Amino acid sequence: MLNQLENLAKCVGGNNELIDQWLQARKGLLVAYYHLIGLKPNKEKHTPLDEEALDAFCHQLVDYLSAGHFLVYDSIVPEGESSSTLTYSGLQENTQQIMALYDSHLENAIDHDNYLSFQEALSGVGEALATRFVLEDKLIQQAME
């Protein structure tokens, strides 16, 4: 996902300050996610959960989702543009999906009994973010047309 982000930033970077800031926020979110899941070379298969990394990711996740809905989407795509309506609906559904996982798994304390369901939820968040980034990239492309 970081490679796709870098490619997008090369294509649209410098054309719109808000989009540039948004892409930087996305990069921060991805780095926090990768740190949380322990995506590092030579990592052991079962490493203990880093509570600070979880807190940092959760804060960035909520901030990123909020910024998208309350600042970015309406600012970059003209109101009522029909091609963006479907994309925006998809983003709203995606936000509900991510927040449901957040509410049910990420904001609660993790212990031995719910570790497996937490890992599955974390994977689900990663998949939902990948879907979200595709939708957001469509909005960016529409804004640049």
Swiss-Prot record:
Localization, UniProt: Cytoplasm
Record has Cytoplasm as a keyword: yes
Biological process according to GO: regulation of DNA-templated transcription
Disulfide bond residue pairs: none
Database matches in Pfam families: Rsd_AlgQ
Keyword terms: Cytoplasm, Transcription, Transcription regulation
Any one annotated GO CC term: cytoplasm
Superkingdom of origin: Bacteria
InterPro entries according to UniProt: Rsd/AlgQ_sf, Sigma70_reg_Rsd, Sigma70_reg_Rsd_AlgQ
Biological role: Binds RpoD and negatively regulates RpoD-mediated transcription activation by preventing the interaction between the primary sigma factor RpoD with the catalytic core of the RNA polymerase and with promoter DNA. May be involved in replacement of the RNA polymerase sigma subunit from RpoD to RpoS during the transition from exponential growth to the stationary phase.
Assembly with partners or alone: Interacts with RpoD.
Family designation: Belongs to the Rsd/AlgQ family.
Stored HAMAP family: Rsd
Protein name: Regulator of sigma D
Species, as recorded: Sodalis glossinidius (strain morsitans)
Source organism phylogeny: Bacteria, Pseudomonadati, Pseudomonadota, Gammaproteobacteria, Enterobacterales
